[in-house]
Swiss-Prot record:
Tissue-specific expression: Cortex of tuber.
Listed name of the protein: Cysteine protease inhibitor 2
Entry's family note: Belongs to the protease inhibitor I3 (leguminous Kunitz-type inhibitor) family.
Source species taxonomy: Eukaryota, Viridiplantae, Streptophyta, Embryophyta, Tracheophyta
InterPro entries noted in UniProt: Prot_inh_Kunz-lg
Amino acid sequence: LVLPEVYDQDGHPLRIGQRYIINNP
């Protein structure tokens, strides 16, 4: 399973285990 990389407002990838966190703008 390939997940898209999600970045926070600082441009750092967010990931906990195998789950990505998506911040709402």
